[in-house]
Amino acid sequence: MINIYTDGSATKSRSGWGWLAVYPEGQQEHESGTSIGATNQRMELMAALRALIWWKREGHCRWDSDDDVTIHTDSAYLYNCWADKWWVKWENNGWRNSQDAPVANMDLWKYLTTFFKDPQVSFAKVKGHSGHVYNEMADKLATGAIKAEEEQWLKIQEKNDKINIELSEILLDYSMKKYPVDETIKRIRKACGC
């Protein structure tokens, strides 16, 4: 039995997902990623989907076919869809919900339901932010992915701000005729790293 802990996270501008697989002998594998503007629920689904794709891909070359997987999630949205078989109703209704509207996150649900049909796959509900070690680790993967992307974006913004300030100074100097055209062009190229 392989246990995989998944989590999704979202801020105003960034979203992240992460999963942590724990082998019976204690070895661990993990993955995380980000998206822009996705909801927390979508990231919960993405974490589970990416984990199951990994499990299936690795399962053919690392474990015998008797290895089952349990996805541990703090998402009621994901767990209830599997446990209460919402997905069966959606499939039978042309991927429309009980209000006859298209199912939210349908693209991800369609992939996830292929795993729901696999008897080796099960889901377990865990309480979020309750101190469960592996669930907390999955949460840190999801939130850490967002933080890493935001830090990278801030570094790029800081660099761009410095370039913009330098270019403004160069153009101001040019407008005040402090430097000739050819010297101004050299300074612009240097500022831009050209």
Task: List PLM regions with ranges.
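Short intrinsically disordered terminal tails
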Residues: 1, 190-194
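Residues that form generic nucleotide/phosphate-binding pockets
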Residues: 111, 115, 141, 145, ...
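RNase H-like nuclease fold core
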Residues: 1-42, 46, 53-56, 82, ...
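RNase H catalytic domain
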Residues: 6-14, 30, 49-137, 151
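Charged/polar low-complexity intrinsically disordered segments, enriched in acidic residues
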Residues: 155-190
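A two-mode feature
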Residues: 126-127, 138, 142-164
